[in-house]
Design a protein with these regions (language model features):
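N-terminal helix-turn-helix DNA-binding core of bacterial DNA-binding proteins
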Residues: 8-49, 70-81
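A generic structural-conservation signal
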Residues: 38, 66-67, 102
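Alpha-helical residues within the helix-turn-helix
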Residues: 41, 52, 58-59
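Beta-hairpin "wing" of winged helix-turn-helix
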Residues: 58-69, 75
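Amphipathic alpha-helical dimerization/coiled-coil segments
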Residues: 1-9, 27, 79-117
Length: 117
């Protein structure tokens, strides 16, 4: 059996985190649901760029959408778990000397107590 066998889903998940724009989208979606238009205004990017990143994030299982009229609202998928992953990444980045706020809720106590910023 190949050493990489079965790692495809994990690689797809981490691919979702591998781009600064996708991280910015995730960070903004952590504040609640948003339409593509709202994300483009917040990020200052073209609609096609944001839509492409949302498609990637949806393919990775990190975001979900629901139709509202002619638009779609995007939100984090598996929200509590995704907040935990982002908070853990913040702690790891802090330990390595590269503190970054990835999740607006990182100061919110999780199952293991308060998250470190």
């Amino acid at each position: 059996m190949s050493p990489t066998a079965g790692l495809g889903p994990a690689a797809a998940l981490f691919h979702g985190f591998s781009d600064p724009t996708r991280l910015a989208i995730l960070r903004h979606l952590a504040t609640g649901e948003h339409k593509v238009r709202e994300l483009t205004e917040h990020l200052g990017l073209a609609q096609s760029t944001v839509s492409a990143h949302l498609a990637c994030l949806a393919g990775c299982g990190l975001v979900a959408s629901r139709p509202v009229g002619r638009a779609s609202l995007y939100a984090l998928a598996a929200e509590p778990e995704l907040h935990q992953v982002l908070a853990a990444a913040e702690r790891l980045l802090t330990v390595t000397g590269h503190a970054v706020e990835l999740c607006p809720h990182s100061g919110t106590p999780g199952p293991d107590g308060p998250a470190a910023a």
